[in-house]
């Protein structure tokens, strides 16, 4: 069995953050996964994640414990950093997770061939987006950010996240006009599934090749959205 989830946004100051964490932990603990099964977390599990040399975020400690329990049972856990938690450098791998980097990545598991990524950069050629992405991925900028005290760094980042969400609001999927849809159509025809997050709106469309394009919903306002192969 292969299970996918994304966009939990642990720590997001909207609604009830503690309830959201409990809901996600309950879902993880209820998964009927065993040795040889796989769990793919496709980004933005945390609303903000940044690793210092000796410090990691406190939000989602019970989530980490639940993931460790799954790995102790022999479940393979894969993590694709999103645009909110891209600064996960080494700690998840030290815990035993598989970091998906670079993205997208193609897997062939249990007889199914699929491409996964968070989805924020695929097919997007807007100059403003590419500029901001280069800054976020810059080793120099990351080193500068690391000089900030965590209290200042996390306060700034969470306010940025809140403001960005209020500015952009709810996203409306544009179907065949979407750059991500067009990107998936341009990929090899033997890929059976394209599975992404990021857009915060559920999508399940069949491409001209017969492949399925799956966009995972977010966990912000309730439910336990996921996809299973």
Name every feature range the model reports, one short phrase each.
Residues 26, 69, 90, 94, ...:
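Charged/polar, solvent-exposed surface patches and flexible loops
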Residues 119-179:
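Active-site-proximal loop/helix segment associated with metal-binding centers of metalloenzymes
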Residues 5, 10-109:
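Core catalytic region of metal-dependent phosphoesterases/phosphodiesterases
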Residues 32, 51, 55, 90-94, ...:
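Short amphipathic alpha-helical patches
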Residues 38-44, 74-80, 114-118, 136-143, ...:
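Low-complexity, flexible helical/coil segments
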Residues 98, 102, 113-115, 120, ...:
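Conserved beta-sheet core of the metallophosphoesterase superfamily
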Residues 47-70, 148-152, 163-174, 183-191:
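N-terminal short leaders/motifs
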Residues 1-3:
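Extreme N-terminal starter segment of soluble prokaryotic enzymes
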């Amino acid at each position: 069995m292969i299970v996918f989830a994304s966009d939990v946004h642990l720590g997001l100051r909207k609604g009830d953050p503690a309830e959201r964490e409990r809901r996600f932990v309950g879902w993880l603990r209820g998964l009927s996964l065993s040795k040889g099964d796989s769990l793919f977390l496709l980004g933005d599990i945390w609303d903000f994640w940044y690793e210092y040399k000796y410090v990691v975020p406190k939000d989602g400690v019970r989530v980490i414990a639940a993931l460790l329990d799954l790995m102790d049972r022999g479940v393979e856990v894969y993590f694709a950093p999103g645009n909110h938690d891209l600064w996960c450098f080494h700690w998840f791998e030290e815990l035993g997770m598989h970091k998906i980097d670079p993205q997208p990545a193609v897997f062939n598991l249990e007889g199914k061939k699929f491409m996964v990524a968070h989805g924020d950069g695929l097919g997007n050629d807007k100059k403003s987006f590419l500029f901001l992405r280069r800054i976020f991925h810059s080793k120099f900028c990351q080193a500068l950010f690391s000089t900030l005290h965590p209290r200042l760094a996390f306060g700034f980042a969470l306010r940025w996240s809140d403001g960005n969400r209020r500015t952009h609001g709810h996203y409306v999927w544009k179907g065949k006009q979407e750059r991500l849809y067009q990107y998936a159509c341009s990929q090899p025809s033997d890929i059976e599934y394209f599975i992404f997050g990021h857009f915060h709106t559920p999508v399940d469309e069949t491409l001209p090749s017969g492949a399925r394009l799956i966009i995972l919903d977010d966990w912000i306002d309730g439910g336990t959205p996921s996809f299973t192969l």
